[in-house]
């Protein structure tokens, strides 16, 4: 078997435990405890568990949104747990995130055009003409009409907004998508459409997925393998 492109070793994340002025020490919350996972190129690894077991905390730790309390995370053999700002921006070209609630993750003041242009401009530094070409392609591959580029997020349904969220994640042409409950905020009929789109994109673009959900039935469709998080620890399903 080939080497994993993303390796998680003994990663833990704890909150609290700090002494507060003139108050008892805050209790320690073990959000993620000693997690080991391997993600291979072209893989779709599902991570399932009940709400509160640390799935979303793990995803945010991988992305560097919050640091791990212990452990290491490797991308293509490089430890990415202590990257500085510039190094983290380079990593975000290759690893992108799709959020649970598309409406809260899209800036309501910006048009879709501005939302999609932002990562291309900030992370890739490409010119306006190339950004426009890429935006049209992104809208096409998520099955959205090009005229929607000049609309704002509140003008879309939940399913349409999540398609925009997926397009934004694909704007840097990443290798890995971390999908944190990407369909849980959607109606069941729309969930099926988004899952079908994600499977199609994985095959067409050669993507690798870490797919997080509380619903094993949702993961059964897009996942090659599933790990179960229980008491903040994953075990093979």
Task: List where the protein language model places each region.
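ABC ATPase NBD coupling module
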Residues: 21-26, 80-96, 114, 122, ...
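Helix-to-loop junction immediately C-terminal to a conserved catalytic motif
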Residues: 63
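Conserved ABC ATPase "signature" region
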Residues: 79, 129-147
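Conserved ABC ATPase signature
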Residues: 152-156, 160
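Conserved catalytic motifs of ABC-family nucleotide-binding domains
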Residues: 173
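P-loop NTP-binding/switch modules centered on Walker-like glycine-rich loops
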Residues: 186, 190-237
């Amino acid at each position: 078997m080939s080497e994993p492109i993303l390796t998680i070793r003994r990663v833990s994340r704890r909150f609290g435990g700090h002494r507060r002025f003139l108050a008892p020490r805050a209790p320690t919350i073990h959000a993620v405890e000693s997690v080991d996972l391997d993600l291979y190129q072209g893989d779709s690894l599902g991570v399932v568990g009940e709400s509160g077991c640390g799935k979303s905390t793990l995803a945010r730790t991988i992305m560097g949104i919050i640091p791990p309390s212990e452990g290491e995370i490797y991308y293509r053999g490089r430890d990415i747990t202590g990257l500085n700002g510039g190094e983290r921006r380079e990593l975000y070209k290759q690893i992108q995130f799709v959020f649970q609630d598309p409406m809260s993750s899209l800036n309501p003041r910006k048009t879709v055009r501005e939302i999609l242009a932002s990562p291309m401009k900030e992370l890739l530094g490409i010119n306006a003409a190339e950004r426009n070409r890429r935006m049209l392609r992104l809208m096409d591959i998520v099955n959205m009409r090009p005229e929607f580029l000049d609309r704002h997020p509140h003008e879309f349904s939940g399913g349409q907004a999540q398609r925009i969220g997926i397009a934004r994640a694909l704007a840097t042409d990443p290798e890995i998508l971390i999908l944190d409950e990407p369909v849980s905020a959607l109606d069941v009929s729309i969930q099926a459409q988004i899952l079908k789109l994600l499977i199609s994109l994985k095959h067409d673009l050669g993507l690798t997925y870490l797919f997080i959900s509380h619903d094993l039935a949702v993961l059964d469709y897009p996942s090659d393998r599933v790990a179960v998080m229980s008491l903040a620890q994953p075990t093979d399903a």
